[in-house]
């Protein structure tokens, strides 16, 4: 014990450490109680022995207050490593020898530090300068932050204003589009209501006619009611032309009557076409009276059952049949009048003039494709689109231009032929006149002057002929230049149309590439998501094997160890003789009597009790379970005294403050507390497992949602692909075919132009004849006469 007390810290040092470092003070609200006094030195000596000695050494040497720690750090910062001795002197203020040594070291340090005073001052000045610089930089950074925040606010305000303006514009455009759509819907609804009103008026008239009919019977009334029930479903037929915007509302009866009338009209047109060739301009019938008899319709099994049913149902109500036929006739008349308004009489006259002046029949121009009379007015019952490339407005214009050019060429050829004929007659007369003058030249003696005059006249005639030829060639060139300019303009239009189509093709290709990119991206994302969610169960199993399962195993091990520890405690309790360790008194005096020797009093009893306490502490340090209940009882006796003096109460408060450094030695309460902590840990880990399950469920739901989204994207992509393959690709092929056709037409026109350019001028109008001879013949005749006249003039 003496060796232990010599190495152990003194109670005075412990008390000074409590007051200075730990800030131990008297309890204010308990001034009158037993806990208001400072613990005595004897009480501190009782707890500073055994296993508590190294703990008190560690606490006194290592545990310092916040003020001391701050002072030590400041000294280290200012003085550096030279002040270690002063720090050492401030660490152990409880010992007298350390105080004297600290004073001597302070004197030596003061002597040595005089040489470093200037260095310290320089360091302090540098530190102050650095602090000022840091403060200045902080102010600069703070000011720049304020400027940056102000600029960010300004930018955000401008962005908000711009976004607001864009939103307002978008809202205005949206409202405008909605109003336009609503206006259009209102117009359509107005037209539909007007048609409904018209149809209702027709029904009212039909009902009035049915009531006023004299020959009405119950059968007719029943048939009318049945038909009216069947006619409750309307069929809407829109006009083929978008400009007319015709909406036709008709019942089932009227539709059937219209179909029958159309069929009868088509049969009548076919019969007239076959009977009268002049109907199509193919010939003239010599005996029209015989052909008239062919117009009679003799149906021998040609009427279909559907037509018979419609006719029988219509004949049950003759007034209604007549009204329907009249309405159909009025509609056909209106359509015919509209078609007649579209006809250009002047163009037709030019076409007929060109047709019959050139003694050949050309194809008629195609009718309007969108016309509802295309079947009746197209030749041989063909649809208007079948003859679209045979005759069109462009071809009609080409024929008109060709007719004008042919007419100009004909007039020019006729003028040239007439001039050549007049020149021939003049040359013949001149030749006859020159021969007469040649016979009499020897008489008159004036041959030289006459030959000069004739030479001048020939020169003048030659110049006039050349001028006329140049004039004609100039006119021809002007007409050809105009035609070529028109061809260039048409070719430019064709090139522009081809460029537009090519631009559409490029746009289509760009959209197709974008769709392909989107499709591949979605497919890749889908595959990645499928792979990720397929790996989730494995990852969850691995995570559980790494976290939850080991934690559960640890809990099981802790429970087993706690169970073993409880069994050891119980066995120790039963092994103790008469359970005397658990029957310790609850007062310090009784504790001293029970731990001391029987019959001993005074210091001997205290020494014997201290010896027994040291042995008990050693047993507890050796992990002997039988010593733990005694220590717990002693702690309870010290912490909850009954009528003790002030020193023992202060000792109990000190022990309460030192609970953080007393290691629990495994009492029943500690075991139960550990078991409760283990159970709480199990519950926490069960909650973690449930959270993991909920996360897995959420992940499964998210996977299903993502699969639905992916399926929707795939369906949308397939729909877009079908749209591309069904609509865009045929349109693209049609555009390419049209471009190829336009290119072929341009090549054909270029070939015609080259062919015309290679031909001589005399072959342009070789079919024109004057007095039975062509222009080339007359020109050759003129050349022969000129040569003969030159020969005769040379002879003379």
Swiss-Prot record:
<feature type="region of interest" description="Disordered">
    <location>
        <begin position="79"/>
        <end position="120"/>
    </location>
</feature>
<comment type="subunit">
    <text>Part of the augmin complex composed of 8 subunits. The complex acts on microtubules and interacts with gamma-tubulin in spindles and the phragmoplast.</text>
</comment>
<dbReference type="GO" id="GO:0051225">
    <property type="term" value="P:spindle assembly"/>
</dbReference>
<keyword id="KW-0498">Mitosis</keyword>
<dbReference type="GO" id="GO:0070652">
    <property type="term" value="C:HAUS complex"/>
</dbReference>
<dbReference type="GO" id="GO:0051301">
    <property type="term" value="P:cell division"/>
</dbReference>
<dbReference type="GO" id="GO:0009524">
    <property type="term" value="C:phragmoplast"/>
</dbReference>
<dbReference type="GO" id="GO:0005876">
    <property type="term" value="C:spindle microtubule"/>
</dbReference>
<comment type="similarity">
    <text>Belongs to the HAUS5 family.</text>
</comment>
<feature type="coiled-coil region">
    <location>
        <begin position="462"/>
        <end position="501"/>
    </location>
</feature>
<dbReference type="InterPro" id="IPR044706">
    <property type="entry name" value="AUG5_plant"/>
</dbReference>
<dbReference type="InterPro" id="IPR029131">
    <property type="entry name" value="HAUS5"/>
</dbReference>
<keyword id="KW-0131">Cell cycle</keyword>
<feature type="compositionally biased region" description="Polar residues">
    <location>
        <begin position="80"/>
        <end position="92"/>
    </location>
</feature>
<protein>
    <recommendedName>
        <fullName>AUGMIN subunit 5</fullName>
    </recommendedName>
</protein>
<keyword id="KW-0963">Cytoplasm</keyword>
<comment type="function">
    <text>Involved in microtubules reorganization during spindle and phragmoplast development.</text>
</comment>
<keyword id="KW-0132">Cell division</keyword>
<dbReference type="GO" id="GO:0051011">
    <property type="term" value="F:microtubule minus-end binding"/>
</dbReference>
<keyword id="KW-0175">Coiled coil</keyword>
<keyword id="KW-0493">Microtubule</keyword>
<feature type="coiled-coil region">
    <location>
        <begin position="115"/>
        <end position="191"/>
    </location>
</feature>
<dbReference type="Pfam" id="PF14817">
    <property type="entry name" value="HAUS5"/>
</dbReference>
<keyword id="KW-0206">Cytoskeleton</keyword>
């Amino acid at each position: 014990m003496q060796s232990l007390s010599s190495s152990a810290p003194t109670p005075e040092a412990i008390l000074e450490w409590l007051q200075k470092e730990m800030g131990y003070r008297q309890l204010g609200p308990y001034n009158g109680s037993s806990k208001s006094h400072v613990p005595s030195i004897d009480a501190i000596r009782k707890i500073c022995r055994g296993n508590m000695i190294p703990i008190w050494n560690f606490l006194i040497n290592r545990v310092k207050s916040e003020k001391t720690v701050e002072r030590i750090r400041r000294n280290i910062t200012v003085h550096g490593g030279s002040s270690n001795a002063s720090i050492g002197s401030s660490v152990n203020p409880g010992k007298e020898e350390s105080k004297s040594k600290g004073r001597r070291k302070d004197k030596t340090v003061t002597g040595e530090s005089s040489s470093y005073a200037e260095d310290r001052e320089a360091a302090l000045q540098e530190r102050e300068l650095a602090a000022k610089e840091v403060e200045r930089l902080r102010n600069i950074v703070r000011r720049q932050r304020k400027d940056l925040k102000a600029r960010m606010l300004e930018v955000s305000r401008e962005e908000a204003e711009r976004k607001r303006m864009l939103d307002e514009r978008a809202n205005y455009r949206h409202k405008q589009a909605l109003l336009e759509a609503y206006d259009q819907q209102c117009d359509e609804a107005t037209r539909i209501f007007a048609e409904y009103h018209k149809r209702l008026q027709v029904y009212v008239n039909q009902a009035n006619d049915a009531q006023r009919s004299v020959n009405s019977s119950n059968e007719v009334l029943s048939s009318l009611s049945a038909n009216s029930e069947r006619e409750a479903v309307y069929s809407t037929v829109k006009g083929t032309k978008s400009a007319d915007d015709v909406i036709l509302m008709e019942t089932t009866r009227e539709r059937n009557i219209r179909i029958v009338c159309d069929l009868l009209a088509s049969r009548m047109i076919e019969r007239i076409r076959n009977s009268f060739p002049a109907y199509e301009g193919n010939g003239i019938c010599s005996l029209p009276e015989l052909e008239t008899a062919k117009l009679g319709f003799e149906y021998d099994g040609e009427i279909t059952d559907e037509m018979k049913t419609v006719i029988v149902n219509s004949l049950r109500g003759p007034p209604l049949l007549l009204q329907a036929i009249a309405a159909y006739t009025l509609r056909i008349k209106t359509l015919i009048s509209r078609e007649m308004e579209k006809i250009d009489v002047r163009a037709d006259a030019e076409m007929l003039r060109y047709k019959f002046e050139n003694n050949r029949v050309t194809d008629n121009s195609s009718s309007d494709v969108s016309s509802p009379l295309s079947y009746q007015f197209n030749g041989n019952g063909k649809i208007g689109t079948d003859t679209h490339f045979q005759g069109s407005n462009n071809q009609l214009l080409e024929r008109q231009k060709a007719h004008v050019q042919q007419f100009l060429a004909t007039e020019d050829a006729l003028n040239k032929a007439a001039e050549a004929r007049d020149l021939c007659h003049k040359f013949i007369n001149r030749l006859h006149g020159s021969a007469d003058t040649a016979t009499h030249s020897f008489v008159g003696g004036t041959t030289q002057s006459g030959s000069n005059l004739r030479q001048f006249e020939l020169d003048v005639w030659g110049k006039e002929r050349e001028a006329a030829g140049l004039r004609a060639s100039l006119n021809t060139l002007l007409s050809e230049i105009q035609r070529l300019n028109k061809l260039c303009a048409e070719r430019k239009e064709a090139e522009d149309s081809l460029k537009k189509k090519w631009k559409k093709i490029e746009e289509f290709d760009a959209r197709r590439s974008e769709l392909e990119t989107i499709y591949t991206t979605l497919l890749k994302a889908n595959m990645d998501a499928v792979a990720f969610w397929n790996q989730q169960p494995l990852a969850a199993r691995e995570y559980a094997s790494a976290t939850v399962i080991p934690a559960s195993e640890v809990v099981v091990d802790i429970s087993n160890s706690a169970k073993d520890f409880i069994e050891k405690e119980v066995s120790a309790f039963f092994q103790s003789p008469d359970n005397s360790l658990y029957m310790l008194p609850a007062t310090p005096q009784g504790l001293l009597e029970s731990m001391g020797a029987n019959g001993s009093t005074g210091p001997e009893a205290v020494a014997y009790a201290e010896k027994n306490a040291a042995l008990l502490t050693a047993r507890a340090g050796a992990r002997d379970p039988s010593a733990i209940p005694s220590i717990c009882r002693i702690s309870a006796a010290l912490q909850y005294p009954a009528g003790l003096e002030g020193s023992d109460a202060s000792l109990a408060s000190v022990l309460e403050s030192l609970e953080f450094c007393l290691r629990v030695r495994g009492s029943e309460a500690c075991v139960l507390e550990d078991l409760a902590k283990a159970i709480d840990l199990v519950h926490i880990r069960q909650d973690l497992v449930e959270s993991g399950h909920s996360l897995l469920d959420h992940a499964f739901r998210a996977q299903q949602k993502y699969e639905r989204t992916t399926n929707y994207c795939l369906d949308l992509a397939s729909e877009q692909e079908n749209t591309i393959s069904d609509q865009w690709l045929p349109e693209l092929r049609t555009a390419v075919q049209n471009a190829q056709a336009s290119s072929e037409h341009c090549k054909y026109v270029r070939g015609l132009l080259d062919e015309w350019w290679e031909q001589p001028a005399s072959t342009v109008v070789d079919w024109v004849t004057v007095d039975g001879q062509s222009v080339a013949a007359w020109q050759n005749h003129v050349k022969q006469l000129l040569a003969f006249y030159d020969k005769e003039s040379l002879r003379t």
